[in-house]
Structures are given as C-alpha cells and as structure tokens.
Amino acid sequence: MRKTAILALEDGSYFVGYSFGAEGETGGELVFNTSMTGYQEILTDPSYKGQIVVMTYTQIGNYGVNDEDIESKSVQVNGFVVKEAFFRYSNWRAKKSLDEYLKENNVVGIYGIDTRALVKKIREKGSMKGVISTVEKDPKKLVQKARELPDISEQNLVEEVSAKDIYYWNQGDYDPRRGFLYRENEKPLVAVIDFGVKFNILRRLVSEGAKVVVVPPENAKEAIEKINPDAIFLSNGPGDPERVISGIRLTREYMEKKPIMGICLGCQIIGLALGGKTYKLKFGHHGGNHPVKDLRTGKIEITAQNHNFAIDPESLPEDVEVTHLNLLDNTVEGIKHKHLPIFAVQYHPENSPGPHDSYYLFKEFVKMAQG
C-alpha cells in the first residue's frame, strides 16, 4: 500500500502525493531541474545542498542507479520531488532502484503530485522554502515549518560539503568497456579548491593531462604555499558566494601569481574577488539545456547549469570582460580578466549530466597552467 506524503510551501500552498525513498520529514529551498536524464548525478551534486529538487521531466527512476554516475560520496539534496517514480528499472549498469538508493541515503521523496503546477509556481513566485513529510498530516503545520526554515543565504553550506583533508585525484573519464581510466600525470599541477567539487570536474582535469590535488578551502593558502601548484581551480558549491570569505581572499592573494579558473560558485567568487557584485536569481538555472553565447566567437553552446546566484555585469571593473551570456535571460555566464590569466564560467562544462559543448575550457585552462 502506498504511503501518503505532503509537500507544503511557505506561501501556504501544499501538494498531497505518495512517499518514496526514506520516510520522515525534510525541508529546504525548492528549485526545479529541466534535465530528462541524469537524476543520479543531480542527486549527488554538492551544489544542491540545502535544497529540495523538483524534476520537470515526468518519468524518473526508470534506468535505476549504478556505481559510476555519482558526483560525490553521498546524496546531497535535502529532498526529491517527481511526477512519476519508477520502482522497477532496466539498464545493464544498474545495481538498484532509485527508491532503494534514496532509502539508503535517508532522503525523503514525494511522487504523484502535479509537478507542472509546482514548477509554474516556482517560476512565477521564485524559489521558496518547503517541507516534505510522511509523518505530519496537517498541511497548516507543515506550512509553518516551511516558513521557519532558515534562508539558504544565511547558511554556511560550503563547510558541510567541502573536503577536510588534502588528497590527490587520478581518476579520468569513464569508458563503458573499460571503466574509469586512471592517469599518473606529472605536470601541470592544479590545486582544486573544494567548495563542493563534482567528481567529473576532477576527471576532466585529469583527462586533459593535469595532476590534480584537492585542497579544503579553510587553510588553503598554507596548502598552496606548501605544494606550489602551477594553477588554481575554484570549484562549484552550494549557497551564497558572499559567505565564502576564504575563497574570495584566496583569489585576491593569488590572482597576480597563478593562473586561476572557476566554475559555478567559483565563477561568482572570482567575480567578487575582482571587484564585482553578485545577486540571487529568481529561481536559478538548473538543467542540461541552457543556450549560452560565447561573445568572443559568436558560437552557441548548449550547457548544463546549476546555480542560484549570478554576477552583476554593471559592477565589474573595466579590466574584466564578460565572455559568455545566457540566451534565456541575458545573465552573465562567463568572465575573463583582460590582463591576468584568470577566467571563469557560470555553467558546468564538465556536463554530468549534460552536453559536451564546453569541454574546450578545460583544455584552455590546462594549457594556461603549462605556461
């Protein structure tokens, strides 16, 4: 027998559906993702820490869960919302169902609700806080709990997902016949500052020839002074970039000493370090089909995105240029310093899930690191 679950929002509305994954209660900021596939990568993306993800595609879970398509060591989302959850799956790599995977990771999910109506609400009103519960049956109480949740901008989420110790990474891209390809690269040495880095970012750097060392953001300066990398990479991560003071200070310390590249949160940190400002988007960019224009070449890239904040182009100093624009809302998707070896993109060129249009950025960065 299916167990009832309720999703209640801070605006007073609620949706009644069915439970899948773990039972219990969870809360967070609701965002929607437009990807048709890649739910396992989405679930394990540290940038989703503190959020409940709503999938716009209707059928989720039909290819199960495998051991390879993970972007961190555990599921990161606070909750999961889908229209139709598949409890039976079919894929040659699958090891378990999505339902089993969520249970193992203690993630509360809800299915069987009108996700189209929910997404329209988020799109029109903006991201809002919500609570999923299988234990509390009074929607009014759940609405009140949603309203009492802390704002995502008030939380230090990077601290929850970043590495605690330095470690080296040599796992490259995945080959369906041979598995992950490992490489013992020697040069250039790239220090990845881990604000919640996705595994596929590390794999892409290794596959392009870099030797990768992952460094926690706290005390990163001491680590960099010790290992003396050829370049610095600022990773993706959750939350408000203005709260990542350590990353902003680190970028300012080394922006005239080392080549630096940033992705997602790393892009915003670079923007702040260079003198710009950031702001929160109404409902963020989350999905694998966002068109971005490279203003230098005129080419259009289809990109994977997952961010809630953006750089204000009017705030950037004259020596920083905007290199990429989102064609859906004209927000900044890439910046570059005119004189220093620093560039960053707001989207995810490593895909996972998503297209491969922007792989060239890793090649450019590794070449820059080689001097």
Swiss-Prot record:
Q: Which reaction does it catalyse?
A: hydrogencarbonate + L-glutamine + 2 ATP + H2O = carbamoyl phosphate + L-glutamate + 2 ADP + phosphate + 2 H(+)
Q: Which SMART domains match?
A: CPSase_sm_chain
Name the pathway it acts in.
Amino-acid biosynthesis; L-arginine biosynthesis; carbamoyl phosphate from bicarbonate: step 1/1; Pyrimidine metabolism; UMP biosynthesis via de novo pathway; (S)-dihydroorotate from bicarbonate: step 1/3
Enumerate the residues binding L-glutamine: S47, G237, G239, L265, Q268, N306, F309
> Which EC main class describes this enzyme?
ligase
| Keywords (A to Z) from UniProt | Amino-acid biosynthesis, Arginine biosynthesis, ATP-binding, Glutamine amidotransferase, Ligase, Nucleotide-binding, Pyrimidine biosynthesis
Outline what the protein does.
Answer: Small subunit of the glutamine-dependent carbamoyl phosphate synthetase (CPSase). CPSase catalyzes the formation of carbamoyl phosphate from the ammonia moiety of glutamine, carbonate, and phosphate donated by ATP, constituting the first step of 2 biosynthetic pathways, one leading to arginine and/or urea and the other to pyrimidine nucleotides. The small subunit (glutamine amidotransferase) binds and cleaves glutamine to supply the large subunit with the substrate ammonia.
What name does UniProt use for this protein? Carbamoyl phosphate synthase small chain
Species name: Aquifex aeolicus (strain VF5)
